[in-house]
């Protein structure tokens, strides 16, 4: 619970209310003994839906999240990128207004991470889910964000705010443009990093 201020979604306070924010840690934390359909439908079960209702609702999003054909598989049978997609779907089903993502792509190799970034941007544009994205990767922050908030050390306070004024969906080569490098430099300067 916040010690001061308020948290608003659509102009209404959501402090102490569940179902608005889905949270995803760095690791996918899929349950290894449950099939993918049962892993992603878990938030719906916890919200009171029957197993059948939860599976049906979760299953209706599999194509959108690029998970076709994985419903009956176990997490160990999927690649890292596919497990992250399943975890993101579970997060989306847990909170339908805001997703809080804590470095969801940090464990992925460069090629998979790049593919996931492009996929993530297209899906978030489609489902219109607001996202608070935590990352230590400056390129990732510039590529995925509308706004970058830079925090101080503990206790964390916002020290800088940088608006990324590039339209979405972002151009495929955005990270190779002078504009991208300018945003990246702004972040580096705000962090006080000397290169």
Annotate each PLM feature.
Residues 34-41:
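Short coil-to-helix segment of the ABC ATPase nucleotide-binding domain corresponding to the Q-loop/switch region
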Residues 99-102:
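Catalytic Walker B motif of ABC-type/P-loop ATPase nucleotide-binding domains
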Residues 74-78, 82:
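Conserved ABC ATPase signature
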Residues 2-17, 57:
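Conserved ABC transporter NBD signature motif
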Residues 93-97:
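A short, proline-enriched helix->beta-strand linker immediately N-terminal to the Walker B motif
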Residues 128-134:
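Conserved H-loop
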């Amino acid at each position: 619970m916040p010690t001061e201020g308020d948290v608003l979604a659509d102009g209404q306070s959501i402090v102490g209310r569940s179902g608005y924010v889905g949270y995803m840690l760095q690791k996918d934390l899929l349950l290894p003994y449950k099939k993918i359909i049962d892993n992603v439908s878990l938030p719906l079960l916890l919200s009171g839906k029957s197993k059948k209702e939860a599976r049906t609702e979760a299953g209706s999003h599999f194509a959108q999240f690029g998970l076709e054909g994985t419903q009956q598989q176990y997490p160990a049978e999927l690649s890292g990128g596919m497990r992250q997609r399943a975890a993101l779907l579970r997060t989306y089903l847990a909170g339908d207004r805001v997703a809080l993502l804590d470095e969801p792509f940090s464990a992925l190799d460069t090629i998979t991470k790049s593919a996931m970034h492009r996929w993530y941007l297209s899906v978030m544009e489609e489902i219109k889910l607001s996202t608070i994205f935590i990352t230590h990767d400056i390129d990732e922050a510039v590529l995925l964000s509308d706004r970058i908030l830079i925090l101080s050390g503990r206790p964390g306070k916002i020290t800088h705010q940088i608006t990324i004024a590039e339209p979405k969906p972002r151009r495929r080569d955005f990270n190779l443009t002078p504009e991208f490098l300018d945003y990246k430099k702004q972040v580096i300067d705000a962090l006080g990093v000397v290169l």
